[in-house]
Amino acid sequence: MAAPPPPPVLPDDVVEEILLRLPPDDPGCLFRASLVCKAWRSAVTHPHFRRRYIGLHRHRAPPVLGFLHDWEDERIPDFVPTTASPFSLPAPDRRFWRPLDCRHGRALFLYDRGQETQELLLWEPITGARQRIPVPSAFRCAWPTAAVFCAAHGCGHRDCAGGPFGVVFVFTLDISPNADVVTSACLYSSETGTWGKLNSREYEFSMDFEHHSSVLVGRSLLYFLSDGGMILEYNLGSGELAAFRPPPDDYGSDNHRFNLMLAEDGGLGVAEAIDFQLILWKREASDGTNARWVLSRIVDLDIDPCTLVPVLGFAEGANAIFVKTIGSLFMIELQSEQAKRVCHNHGFCNLIPVVSFYTPHSRLQVPRGEHQDPAPPLNLLRRGGQQGVWEKKSLELAQLLFDKGCKAINEKDFAHAADCFRHALEIRVRHYGGLAPECASTFYRYGGALLCKAREAANRSGNVSK
């Protein structure tokens, strides 16, 4: 009996309309689609597709793709996804680049190990573009921080990568043992390629910035939380600095259990976790000068009341925060108050959420030359001991699953093939990273198996309806 003819090929415009409706909160779908064939890859990597994709989802907030961190454990990838399916981004090697901030489609890193001068690295997670920014030697200190923001006038900040940006660098220096310490901030402009005027203020206390990232309120006010609990305000327009204290500790809080956030009205807020509750504060200024902290909302957390719950990060644009318990890391969407377990608690101290609409880019690999990391990625280094043995066995299992998936394809058992490729893909992405060449064939086979599985289901449905 002759085999049935293949189904007709869908027109390109119909394929594009289908791909446009893949869910933004599961970016792995678009990435896998880009590996199915050259036509699909050309469609989803075209700038026109990205504009339409973002426009189609203009009424929803951009999703949290994952987070960056500075925890020194080579078993944990530099970028940890929070999405449903396997997904990865080629983040800079955190052995050398400490993540500081992420905003408006750009992430900022600091390199300060064993050099006389520090250096910043700007990375666009979606395009993969990188740019190094030298930091003046006079700014060098132990624990500085920095913030990045889009500098394009009138930008809606939903797709502003590649445009002008600004960086604010904040640091503290002890002038002498008997004098106050000086906290300074300086603004860098990508349009001029230069640092601006240095603005400084003397305080009785030193400010180190290791465990918290910044928050941008409106278009002109940046806030930084020091490790000691003081909040530093920087005015982008005037360059003025101001420092003030966080909310009162009537609830028995401590500095390492709260973090900065945006309040419901768009102003400055603070989230802190006390026992099994999330306490949300906002800063109000009735006359523009005398500001005070006001309790905004209390969210009940469905966790053990004896568990320590530090607030690790706030996702600007997505209105979500990260908290950790003894065993797990959770992301809480503040509007719905829904909590989602992200991963195990690996001892993270600071998280930098990456918030953006994802579409595959034609330039996925890091270019060679000046934008390359100063050392090869962790997955290219030789590993020994128990960890090396475990990873070798995991990769052998991935190959076995891949071979079983190929055999299932030949036997037209597409459901089993998709399961095999999915498990193999999870192992290889965890080891190599989602954009590594070692994962490309698995992505391709997995996407093909899913398409065949869906086509088979559609054919069965058509036969039943007849």
PLM features: residue spans?
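Short coil/linker segments at helix-helix boundaries
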Residues: 451-466
